[in-house]
């Protein structure tokens, strides 16, 4: 009887110990999951978080922004059509040195285009680069995303792809292009993108031959000035009330570039990037620097790691400046709730246009930010001008 009593007590103690361990494990798992959930809410918000529709474009072209915004307001899931509309509007108007100005040729006088579009939901990306003979490159980039398993097509093969889908081929170079090239040639081909060659590219047009390696001058200096109205790339970001992002970029390429050069507009993460779980970003500036550092991608990942948009924007620009002290350009960052910020370097100030948002629902406004090199200032919203006139819409297929 004594032995049976002892066994019964041991069994009860064993069951009690097992029960306590089970409760402890469940409690630990609960608190771990709670911490993970709290962190996710901090980073990404909850389903109940109100999202404000937003349309942002780089530089100060309000007409193109308003056309894109009007498309975004037409109905459900219009972010893709909105950013395409913005790119098309700038392509067919005079936005900086874009195609309408026909003043951004390569050193052989050719006008080639590049464009890209990214879906923040699927993370699919479509782009073309070095494409000649087709005006609306953004439509071809969108076709790469929709109809192929590739991400980027380049050169004459991109033109051939566009023709196969029915896009009209046209001769883009005209008298204005030839005049721009003639002036450049008469000025000793300045500026240009050669280095460490003979004769000196700072004084001569070439042809060039490589210098011996011991004569190379490794530091690269920024000679390609980017100012208001004197740039070749624009980017658009659209966010709808469901939290869906699309970003797009279109460019005629750096003026007097070496033929064959691919720019940041076609490189994922350099000029544009978006992820619906986190947010989106667009960048503009010295494309060769942007391609080396992928600032749009870095900005989104900085927000994923917990930074606010203003912190992410400034961090990215400061990182670029650490490696490229003469960099000029900017980044605009938007989180998944529509909160935006921008930072820049190397300019007096950077302009971008915003439509939508919580306080100013239907008016494009030019935002201005003083660049970090001079004022160490970051912008995070606020109206700077109202542009209520909406120009005639262009149809987006």
UniProtKB/Swiss-Prot annotation:
CDD domains, per database record: Glycosylasparaginase
GO CC, alphabetical: lysosome
Coiled coil: none
Family membership noted in the UniProt record: Belongs to the Ntn-hydrolase family.
The keyword Transcription belongs to this UniProt entry's keyword annotation: no
GO molecular function, one term: N4-(beta-N-acetylglucosaminyl)-L-asparaginase activity
Organism placement in taxonomy: Eukaryota, Metazoa, Ecdysozoa, Arthropoda, Hexapoda
Protein name per Swiss-Prot or TrEMBL: L-asparaginase-like protein GD25160
InterPro entries, alphabetized: Ntn_hydrolases_N, Peptidase_T2
Signal found in the keyword field: yes
Pfam families: Asparaginase_2 (PF01112)
Record key words, sorted: Disulfide bond, Signal
Gene3D superfamilies for this protein: (Glycosyl)asparaginase (3.60.20.30)
Disulfide bridges in this chain: 90-95, 189-205, 344-371
Secretion signal span: 1-22
